[in-house]
Amino acid sequence: MIRYISAMPSPEWEHETPRTLALLGSTGSIGTSALRVVEAHPHRFRVVALAGARNVEKLAAQAARWRPEHLGVLDAAGAAKLRDLLPAGYAPHIHIGPEGYATMATLPEAGTVLSAQVGAAGLRATEAAARHGKVICLANKESLVLAGDIIRRHCAGSGAVILPVDSEHNAIFQALQGHDPASVRRIILTASGGPFRGRSREDLAAVSCRDALAHPNWDMGAKITIDSATLMNKGLEVIEACHLYGVGIDDVGVVVHPQSIVHSLVEYEDGSQIAHLGTPDMRIAIAYCLTWPGVVDAGVPRLDLVKAGSLTFEEPDLHSFPCLELARRAYREGRGMPVVLNAANEVAVSLFLSDRIRFLDIPDIIARALDMHDGTTPHDIEGIEALDEATRRTVYERAGHSNTDGMA
């Protein structure tokens, strides 16, 4: 199990006021929600770094509000544009690209790092934060999917701790509080089922990108919303759970729970299950991580179980949504397969979002990439990045498109 803050009864930063934050991915859904939590409790936090990749205008607005000493963007063109948008007399240090984000994750003045970049692009920063002993509020599940073993070793060596921001893993973290890890029998992740729950493969053949982006419960970014629709998001979370909690792949179950009220469950050896319930709003998990071990008002509507009504559960449809089993296969086989899985998925989702492939092409592209993998097993971050890039290039070439995406 990765070293968690719960293992440290009195961490020295517990009483730090304000807590110093580096928010990587500040312009995305998670980052924006995190800043709403910060704004609601300004005396508790000091924002020292913000990184926003491509959304320079939004980053400039955030920077003008919070005045951090450090900002991060994707490239030099974005940096130049950002400088033009910043208020007169405000001249923060601007970091560029994955290496710049990694530098921001290791800033001495940043005690807590929110890793909320989308996809494999967040790996370098998460790995750097783990090496430097930071408190990591982890929303970037891909970091553990790609390099879970490496990050675990870094945490053990540096004293870094990880708090999971994903609602499901945050729910598990809370359900584990006060219990002996040896008493855990299994972990049960809940999935909303996405916008296409109950649809057959035949029905899915004609769904559009707009249909897939209409998530019934959660307000998320485009990529994770598509992953939710295909059940790949749950597949990635299954792999993440194995790394976070030190459990085997067969000890992580998945049930579809359309109401998204029960965020996940832990089953213990005595047969009991502890569930975490709440309104489907990411601010709950974000606030929990940012203020642990304290608890603050997250600013979300209170859950009323009477108004919520019935809570239902069902098995996932693995025939219509095979991505969940593809993720399980990748983890079981190892040998770099999780890297291939993630890279192929990111390319396929990008192609779908730009209307260049159909919805059902996504799992087909991923399955072909897994079948073609030559067994290369990366042992360091550079090897992971090389396999990621090679997989993306191959998938784009087979799809008849140029490679315009990557870990940057």
From Swiss-Prot:
GO BP: any one term: isopentenyl diphosphate biosynthetic process, methylerythritol 4-phosphate pathway involved in terpenoid biosynthetic process
Q: Tell me the organism's taxonomic lineage.
A: Bacteria, Pseudomonadati, Thermodesulfobacteriota, Desulfovibrionia, Desulfovibrionales
Gene3D superfamilies found in the cross-reference section:
1.10.1740.10, NAD(P)-binding Rossmann-like Domain (3.40.50.720)
Q: Could you say which residues bind NADPH here? A: 27-30, 53-55, 140, 142, 221
Q: What is this protein called?
A: 1-deoxy-D-xylulose 5-phosphate reductoisomerase
Q: In which pathway does it act?
A: Isoprenoid biosynthesis; isopentenyl diphosphate biosynthesis via DXP pathway; isopentenyl diphosphate from 1-deoxy-D-xylulose 5-phosphate: step 1/6
InterPro entries, alphabetized: DXP_reductoisomerase (IPR003821), DXP_reductoisomerase_C (IPR013644), DXP_reductoisomerase_N (IPR013512), DXPR_C (IPR026877), DXPR_C_sf (IPR036169), NAD(P)-bd_dom_sf (IPR036291)
Species of the source: Nitratidesulfovibrio vulgaris (strain DP4) (Desulfovibrio vulgaris)
Provide the cofactor list for this protein: Mg(2+); Mn(2+)
One GO molecular-function annotation for this sequence?
A: 1-deoxy-D-xylulose-5-phosphate reductoisomerase activity
